[in-house]
Amino acid sequence: MTNIRKSHPLIKIINHSFIDLPAPSNISAWWNFGSLLGVCLILQILTGLFLAMHYTSDTMTAFSSVTHICRDVNYGWIIRYLHANGASMFFICLYMHVGRGMYYGSYTFSETWNIGIVLLFTVMATAFMGYVLPWGQMSFWGATVITNLLSAIPYIGTDLVEWIWGGFSVDKATLTRFFAFHFTLPFIVSALAAVHLLFLHETGSNNPSGMVSDSDKIPFHPYYTIKDILGLLVLVLTLMLLVLFSPDLLGDPDNYIPANPLNTPPHIKPEWYFLFAYAILRSIPNKLGGVLALVLSILILAIIPALHTSKQRGMMFRPLSQCLFWLLVADLLTLTWIGGQPVEHPFIAIGQLASILYFFILLVLMPISGIIENRLLKW
């Protein structure tokens, strides 16, 4: 068996990636999220495939086809809710994975980090298009509002929006193409994830200390396979609690009303995992400025390696940066809360303050704290 594992052209690749892979001996549970994201992606592709067998991407029948899946298809309700809540688990793992990368300085692996940012954008696009497919009120108006943001692009904006819509409003053409993209993009995400892993295995994993661990490596299997299975059990337990006890907890009740272009919901908002970016978008009164802030709130991750001023890689031994990091986490949670609130006082002011603080921490305070900590090392 060992000979096949090490000599067969295909099994050899799997062996070098998941079995005999040299891994640092001190990586913590924060390194579990990569494998959990892989599991989430497989779950989403499988449940999505079964949903696509019964779903119809037509404005007249989309809503009733989702109802049909839940009522008439064998275990259709559990497949639908696994898919919907699986997306929430996917984003929880994604944000924790990115947060770990920021905390422990994993962004110094620039190729892996940049592919990760492309992956994040692709997954966000996939999730947005998936939210449109049930063709409820929030699906329709969310699609209308978010795609309409592109009209802020000077000169070509309006033409671009109508090109994406396939007409003069969100209609059948929009729904059909969104379904086509939503079906295709997860496979592109899988390919990008393979490239992400390829770049990671070129350098080897980072570790909590941030130091080079070449002199102290252990095989991935059995040590980290067992550790990853523990994380997987926690993920599955959380997901099943959501699906079986409160499947609509993270959804919007408005999406149980069929899409009606003549009736606007009182408060249009995206899924909870986009609320922080939506709050940043809304905090700027100018449309183009809001769109730029929305894109930059994610794209800012690309310049984090350039803003690294500390002599140490991670934040494990940097108390000032640790305080700023957790302040950033609290700020993102505040933005998520604000994104779900109506546009009125005091939520507008809180959203604007939280948005300014978000960019100020990342662009100004973090680099300054790195310089101060370098000075403290000399004492």
From Swiss-Prot:
Binding site for heme b b562: H83, H182
SUPFAM superfamilies per record: a domain/subunit of cytochrome bc1 complex (Ubiquinol-cytochrome c reductase), Transmembrane di-heme cytochromes
Any Gene Ontology biological process: mitochondrial electron transport, ubiquinol to cytochrome c
Binding site for a ubiquinone: H201
Cofactor: heme b
Cofactor remark: Binds 2 heme b groups non-covalently.
PROSITE patterns noted in UniProt: CYTB_CTER (PS51003), CYTB_NTER (PS51002)
Compartmental location: Mitochondrion inner membrane
Keywords: Electron transport, Heme, Iron, Membrane, Metal-binding, Mitochondrion, Mitochondrion inner membrane, Respiratory chain, Transmembrane, Transmembrane helix, Transport, Ubiquinone
MF-aspect GO terms: metal ion binding; ubiquinol-cytochrome-c reductase activity
TM region(s), chain numbering: 33-53, 77-98, 113-133, 178-198, 226-246, 288-308, 320-340, 347-367
Membrane topology: Multi-pass membrane protein
Keyword check for Mitochondrion: yes
The protein's role, per its UniProt record: Component of the ubiquinol-cytochrome c reductase complex (complex III or cytochrome b-c1 complex) that is part of the mitochondrial respiratory chain. The b-c1 complex mediates electron transfer from ubiquinol to cytochrome c. Contributes to the generation of a proton gradient across the mitochondrial membrane that is then used for ATP synthesis.
Protein family (similarity comment): Belongs to the cytochrome b family.
Subunit structure: The cytochrome bc1 complex contains 11 subunits: 3 respiratory subunits (MT-CYB, CYC1 and UQCRFS1), 2 core proteins (UQCRC1 and UQCRC2) and 6 low-molecular weight proteins (UQCRH/QCR6, UQCRB/QCR7, UQCRQ/QCR8, UQCR10/QCR9, UQCR11/QCR10 and a cleavage product of UQCRFS1). This cytochrome bc1 complex then forms a dimer.
Anything else known: Heme 1 (or BL or b562) is low-potential and absorbs at about 562 nm, and heme 2 (or BH or b566) is high-potential and absorbs at about 566 nm.
Name this polypeptide is given: Cytochrome b
Organism: Panthera tigris
Lineage start: Eukaryota, Metazoa, Chordata, Craniata, Vertebrata
